[in-house]
Structures are given as structure tokens and as C-alpha cells.
């Protein structure tokens, strides 16, 4: 091969390499864009890594489970890994005795630099009906604002046993936002088993009950993957009061408060919004006198058994 032919061949190879490189760059860019635009259900189908957040009460924490690994969320994590063959991380911030307001606080206070793709929320058992509509919607708004591309699944707790006023309130909020519902009430009722066979204490699902929780959430996910749906509706809030929760500031007792004596703490701060207190669980009555600008604001008492 003479030099002219060699130069021609070299030019052709360079052109081919440049074309292949360009195609690879375009492919990577398209994949990156798809990953950014996909919601949770499409990410599962496309094999992308997903991050799941669980915000619930004691049932969400796996209370009632008799065998480690049988917790509904651990079964779900194992299943999801078989679906997309990629990384599936689950962050569970559920706590026993929590109400919807606590779920809002946990969501807003979470600072782990993870962009969640799916949030599973479940409250109602410990909530009073008064305020539930605002607090539950505050969780939805918190997730929507903090993780704009995050899908939500709402679990209707089997411990309610029927469609109580709390459950109806939650269903109404989910309908408004287009949030898929995992109905463990009907799942327990249609299981062919007595309720006492699914819960040893009448509230928390045992191993058999955990299996039903897992299957119910799994079915919701499978249906949305198959239909390529599941994104929340971009709608206005139902209750305007929910926007009082938009501004969230966490003041920690260890660094923001000044201890005056064994029972008195002071905080110098300027803020507006809904005031809440995070209690340490102590049996009996837990009373706090709250003063704002030197005047008694409120004296709430919380009782823990």
C-alpha cells in the first residue's frame, strides 16, 4: 500500500471513529435525558436505579413482624430488584405512634441528598379526624415540592378495618392528586383469613399480614408499570391552609436552644408558620408551657402509654 492509499485509509478510519464517538455521545445524552424524565414506574421498566422513601407509623416500621426479613418493605425491596436488575434503595423514616403531622415533619427534616423516585405514605390509625385533611395534604405537598418527579403510593391501613372518616378523608386527597391507593382494608377482608390470623394484637400485621401489605403495594406498582402511568396530577391544593406548612424550619434542642435550667429552654428566633414540638417518648403526661415574646402562648399536654 502506497502512502496515498495509507492516508486515505487513515482518513476513513478517523471519520468512522468520529462518527462512532458522536453516536455514542448522542446515545448517552438520550439515556441521561430519559432517566431525568422518567418517573418511578418507567425507571423500573427501563432498568434505572430507584430510591424509595417510606413515611409511616408503626406499621410502616414493620411492627408486628414475627420473622426478620418478612417486613412488607423488605419484601418489596427484594422484589423491585428482580424487576429492574438495578439498585433499589429504601429509606424508612417510619416511627411508632406517629400521626400525619409527624410525617410532614419527617419529610421536611430529611436531609440526605437523595432524590426520591417513590414515596409510600400511610397514616390514619393514630390521627384524630380534626386536622387530618390538612396534615395529610401537607405530606403530599412536602413530597411534591421537595421531590418534584417523585411518585406517591398511599396505603389505607388494615387496622381501620372499615372505611372510617379518616380513610374517606385520605381517599379524597388521593383522588384529587391522582395518587394510587394500596387498599389493605379490602385486601385483608378478601384474604379468606380471619383478621386475628393476620394480626396478633389487632393493629399490627403479623408475618401473614405483612405478606398481604407487600402484595397489595406490589400490585399497585405492577399495574402502573404496565400502564406506564402513576405521575401525580399538577393541581392546586384542596385546603389553602396547607400552604401554612410551606415554610419549614427545624430548631434543635442541642444547638438552637439555650438551657436556662433543668426544665427551661429559650430560643431567640423570628419565624412564622405552624408551631410544632418533637417529643421524646416518656410514659405518662408530657406537659410544656410555651411562651412567645414573654407571654404564655399555649400549654399542651401529650400522653404516652
Task: Pin down the residues of each PLM region.
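Surface-exposed patches in mature extracellular/periplasmic domains of secreted proteins
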Residues: 87-93, 154-155, 228-230
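Intrinsic structural disorder
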Residues: 1-24, 28-29, 48, 53, ...
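Alpha-helical cap/lid subdomain in secreted, periplasmic
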Residues: 105-226, 282-289, 293, 297, ...
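N-terminal secretory targeting modules
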Residues: 1-53, 60-66, 218-305
Amino acid at each position: 500500500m502506497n502512502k496515498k492509499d495509507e492516508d486515505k485509509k487513515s482518513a476513513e478510519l478517523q471519520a468512522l471513529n468520529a462518527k462512532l464517538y458522536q453516536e455514542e455521545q448522542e446515545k448517552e445524552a438520550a439515556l441521561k435525558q430519559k432517566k431525568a424524565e422518567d418517573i418511578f414506574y418507567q425507571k423500573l421498566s427501563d432498568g434505572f436505579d430507584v430510591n424509595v422513601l417510606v413515611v409511616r407509623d408503626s406499621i410502616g416500621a414493620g411492627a408486628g413482624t414475627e420473622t426478620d426479613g418478612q417486613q412488607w418493605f423488605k419484601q418489596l425491596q427484594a422484589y423491585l430488584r428482580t424487576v429492574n436488575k438495578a439498585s433499589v434503595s429504601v429509606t424508612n423514616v417510619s416511627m411508632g405512634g406517629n400521626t400525619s403531622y409527624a410525617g410532614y415533619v419527617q419529610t421536611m427534616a430529611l436531609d440526605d441528598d437523595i432524590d426520591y423516585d417513590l414515596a409510600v405514605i400511610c397514616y390514619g390509625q393514630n390521627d384524630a379526624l380534626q386536622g387530618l385533611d390538612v396534615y395529610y395534604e401537607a405530606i403530599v405537598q412536602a413530597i411534591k415540592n421537595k421531590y418534584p418527579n417523585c411518585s406517591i403510593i398511599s396505603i389505607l391501613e388494615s387496622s381501620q378495618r372499615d372505611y372510617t372518616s379518616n380513610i374517606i378523608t385520605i381517599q379524597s386527597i388521593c383522588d384529587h392528586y391522582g395518587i394510587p391507593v394500596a387498599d389493605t382494608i379490602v385486601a385483608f377482608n378478601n384474604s379468606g383469613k380471619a383478621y386475628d390470623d393476620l394480626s396478633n394484637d389487632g393493629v399490627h400485621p403479623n408475618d401473614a399480614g405483612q405478606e398481604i401489605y407487600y402484595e397489595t403495594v406490589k400490585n399497585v406498582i405492577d399495574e402502573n408499570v404496565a400502564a406506564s402511568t402513576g405521575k401525580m396530577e399538577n393541581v392546586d391544593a384542596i385546603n389553602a391552609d396547607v400552604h401554612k406548612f410551606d415554610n419549614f424550619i427545624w430548631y434543635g434542642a442541642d444547638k438552637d436552644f439555650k438551657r436556662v435550667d433543668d426544665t427551661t429552654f429559650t430560643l431567640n428566633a423570628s419565624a412564622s408558620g405552624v408551631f410544632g414540638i418533637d417529643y421524646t417518648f416518656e410514659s405518662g403526661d408530657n406537659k410544656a408551657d410555651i411562651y412567645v415574646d414573654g407571654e404564655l402562648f399555649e400549654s399542651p399536654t401529650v400522653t404516652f402509654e
